[in-house]
Amino acid sequence: MSPVEPAVIAKMYIDIEDRAEVVDKDTYLKATVRIESELESDRLEVPTEIRGRGNSTWNMPKKPYRLRLAAASPVLGMPAERDWALLANFADKTLARNKLGMTLGERTGMVWTPRSRFVELHVNGDNRGVYQVYEHVKTGPDRADVEPLDEEVDIDPQTISGGWLLEVDKRYDEDVCWDTSLNLPICVKSPGFDGDDAATPGHPSALQAEYIRTYVDSAEQALDKPDEEWRQYFDVPALIDWYLVNEIMRNYDAKMGTSVYLHKSRSGPLVFGPLWDFDIGAGNIDFDGVETPTGWWIRDSVWHSKLFSRPNFRQEVFTRWCELERANITTGLGEMVDNIAAFISAGPVERNFQRWPYMGTYVWPNFFVGPTYESEVDYLKSWLKQRVDWMSGEYQREFGACPGG
């Protein structure tokens, strides 16, 4: 469930020891974080550490950050944890695409979609603009809820099977990574140790790493078999929901390139998710033809293309599409955008673009460059309507109208 939003955006103040600045993604600096909100339950002051985060986003003027609190704490109504991400959304001038993608995930009922809250961020007294406080992708009871895996104990056929958190990551940012036979780069996020997550210290043993590699490779090979063996390797409803959210958003990274997460519980199948990274989705990109609201994207990826060659799988996707349509999820995207924009607009948005005066200026990889915040929001809403209309038309051509539609 999403945390309750106050009527007014909260303010977050981070004061770094000796007024130092965050200059890299490796070095944690000691700091204090304080949150002011009209909701008394959201107010917080706690020691923390802070460093940079992100890949292409780290090279932008408005920097994203990682927080590691001194102790697990609830943040703005979200469950208590130590590890948090602060997303700057610099390339997305609506500041709304990441929130929209995650809202879609929540509406579909995906098992865990990272929760977030907007804040106005101040670092060392400097207003840095509107940020999103996000749950960091990791394992845990209120995150990707899979069993902890001990490298020395969990080695028998049952316990070795979970829990795992994997990422399709062409950057190979983890210690245990491999390429599948179809050249998909798979990395183990958990169990692992990157200095951030005290809950999952150590590395998978060689035996455990071989297990998960064999499991993923077997799942991939099953996609090429004419029977239905592949279903034993994947949570099919989760796969379909993950697919539809990313296809609606035409999410560039989700075409099995990077920021594609899968998790696996003990004795369970691979579950697509959590969702991540929508800032250059929904028409906010100017290369590879992904800016247009027409055409399949995720469907043509290495794994999904094999799934969509199966008529029964296509039928299941259509059935789920119709369910989302009847629930006003696919047809309610414009209202979702309006609600997000209304919450952060006026003062916070105005101050954001005073601090970062680039409205009306191209920023990588913008396709549309609007002169005002309102024009950026209107473009996003128009793009989403065209996208849903196109997808609906394609489904109708193959299957006819949704039942009861």
Language model region names:
Residues 1-100:
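Conserved NTP-binding catalytic cores of kinases and kinase-like/nucleotidyltransferase enzymes
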Residues 36, 124-125:
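Short strand-turn-strand beta-turns centered on an Asx-Gly dipeptide
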